[in-house]
Structure formats: C-alpha cells, structure tokens
Regions:
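Cytoplasmic membrane-interface "Motif A"-like loop-to-helix N-cap segments
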Residues: 33-47
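C-terminal ends and interior cores of transmembrane alpha-helices
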Residues: 48-62
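Intracellular juxtamembrane helix-capping segments at the cytosolic ends
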Residues: 79-94
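A late C-terminal transmembrane helix in Major Facilitator Superfamily
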Residues: 24, 95-128
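A membrane-interface helix-boundary motif in multi-pass transporters
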Residues: 38-41, 121-141
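Short amphipathic helix-loop junctions that connect adjacent transmembrane helices
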Residues: 1-7
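Helix-to-loop junctions at the C-terminal end of transmembrane segments
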Residues: 25-36, 126
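Multi-pass alpha-helical transporter architecture, strongest
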Residues: 57-59, 131, 136-167
C-alpha cells in the first residue's frame, strides 16, 4: 500500500475492517431514527462520503496519517450501504416477494461486487492500466450507487408516508 511496510498496512487494514462495525450500526440508526426509515437518503449520503474519502486517499502523497484516516473512514462508511441495500429492497418489494428481493440483492452484490468486479476486474485494471484507473472506476461505482439509489427516493417517500398514515 503506497510503499508502506507490511506491519503498518496490516494495522491499517485491520482498522478499516473494525471501523465497519460501528459504521454499519450507526448507518442503521441514522436510517431508522434520523431519516425515519428512509434508506435511500442515508445510502446516498454515505456514498458521497465514501467517494470523498476515496478521492482524498487517491490524491494524498505518502502520508501515513492521512491515508489511515481515509481508509478507516472508508471502512466505517462503505459497509452501511451494503447492509442497507438489502433492507431497502425488502422495504420496496411486495411482502410475498421479500425473499426473492433479498436473494437477488445478495446474489448480485456478491457476484458483481465481490467475486467479479472487486477481485478480478480491479486487479486486471491495476495490472494493465494502473492505479489511477482503478480509483476512477471506484469513484464511478460510487456515482452509480448514488444514481441508482436516487431512482428509489420517490417510491420510498410514498411508502414511508403510507406506512406513517396507517399508524
């Protein structure tokens, strides 16, 4: 990682993963209590912040403290939307299709996110085009996540309003 020794990289990566725990919990709390069940708004805010920290990390020249802050922030912020997308799909899908909605979001998230794009495609891009292009792709993925989530805002507002009127 940017020429740092393996010991420093190990600690930073551990901090990145550990930051995901409070990040995911806080994302759920923000979604439920601050935005009253509005998963899309929470996801969009988190994705903007992920993009910001990815950009800062990309542009920072060999600064262990800043790189660590960025990676911990990314770890804190990225897993919340990963969790919320499944919850969001359950909120938007008809009750009798809830299992299918959860299964499809899990499958496509794993297949295209972890198994295919994150591991194979980004490795290929780094090897053949360099790190700059990998960061451009990551920022593009953040933008796409924001845009696709934005398509659900109106339907989500309707469902939240309808749910509030029933109670």
């Amino acid at each position: 990682m940017k020429g740092y020794d393996s010991g420093a990289v190990g600690w930073i990566y551990s901090a990145y993963e550990i930051a995901a725990i409070p990040g995911t919990i806080i994302c759920g709390i923000v979604s439920d209590y601050v935005f009253k069940g509005r998963r899309a708004i929470t996801t969009m805010i988190y994705m903007v912040l992920v993009a910001l920290f990815v950009f800062i990390y990309w542009q920072t020249e060999h600064n262990l403290v800043m790189d660590s802050i960025c990676l911990i922030a990314i770890g804190f912020l990225i897993y919340g939307p990963v969790m919320l997308i499944g919850v969001h799909a359950l909120d938007l899908a008809p009750k009798k299709a809830a299992g299918t909605a959860a299964g499809l979001t899990g499958f496509f998230g794993y297949f295209f996110g972890t198994a295919l794009l994150a591991n194979i495609m980004l490795g290929y891009v780094v090897d053949h085009l360099g790190w700059d292009w990998s960061f451009i792709i990551l920022l593009g993925a953040c933008a796409l996540a924001f845009i696709f989530t934005a398509f659900t805002v109106r339907e989500e507002q309707y469902l939240v309003k309808e749910s509030t009127n029933k109670h």
